[in-house]
Amino acid sequence: MKVGIALNILTKPGHSDVSVFAEHMALGDLAEPLGFDSLFALEHHFTGYAMSPAPLQLLSYYAGRTKRIALGTAVIVLPWHDPIRVAEEIALLDVISGGRCLFGFGRGAASVEYAGFSIPMEEARPRFAEAAQIIVKALTHEVFDWDGVFFHIPRMSIRPRPISHPERRFYASSVSPESAEIMAKLGFGVLVIMQNEWPMAAADIQRYRDIALSVGHTPRPPIILTNISVAESRAEAQERAMQYLSRKWDSIDDHYHFSDGHLATVPGYEFYGKMTKTYTKMRDDSFRQKATEFYVKLQIVCTPDECLQQLAELQRLTGMNHLVTEFAYGGMPHEESELNMRLFAEQVMPVLQRDPAFASPVLVTPGEAASTAAEGVFAPA
């Protein structure tokens, strides 16, 4: 199994953006020396939720500082961008990195970001689908053109040409069942953020596989992104997770405003309206403890030995062959984030990477996993 780290650069009260960014960049610099296989950058705008407005630019920095590690986006939100510009930047990063990039795409769910870019949210899904098709065509054809609903592109060529067929390493973030269907039909792999009970996430992944096969695509194993809290004792790992994942949850709702229910009436985002009840409960002090415990239970929170057991079960359910981790979240002090990362790298990651038991997952049958629930669903990373 491959193991990566994602940089989710959340602001901290009382700390400058520069200092917070420096802390996360330091974790990024540790990824290759500690033996991680990949480093992922997010895209978000206009709030302190994740200060990473240009993931390809950030990864270009690491392309020059690393030799081996794969570089991934989690994700580029296509409806906010000109697809030609995205294709050019992908091709350039592919060249300067020596073809060691993974490109994740998504459609976003934060109204503040859509408003900031003057893009109607109800156009998100068709914009995503059209932009994705353009990017694939631009990178697989020497010369191409396009006449669509949102984009009209004259005959042109992308230069420099990519060196390693990056379209074969395209993934897309899947939260709703509808998104999984879109990704499967496009032939993309799927990047799943663990925000639902594991059997339910497994059922959505199986649905993606079934759709991909039905339209002639070979489904790839999913990339799974999750938060990690590992410590020598379960109590210490749990205490850290409860404190900082609770704060992360607050930052999610501050950015997405799921608790106000506004997405329930936006075409293409009805699924997110189901999150309203869950997020509203987090604003209720009488329910907050229980809700936080449920969110923490979805993540990997344990001792090193228990981590291996939990990840074996997660792999069995999902068929993942690439785990992407977050060690710094919710304003966690840098020293504690680094300790979290180092302990995982020393005692958990080598087994994941080298033990044959983690090389070829044995998947559950579709009937063993439940369909996506209407409640108990969380937000993107």
Regions found by a protein language model. Give the residues of each.
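Acidic (Asp/Glu)-rich catalytic clusters
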Residues: 32, 59-67, 90-100, 181-185, ...
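Conserved, mostly hydrophobic/aromatic
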Residues: 35, 43, 62, 93, ...
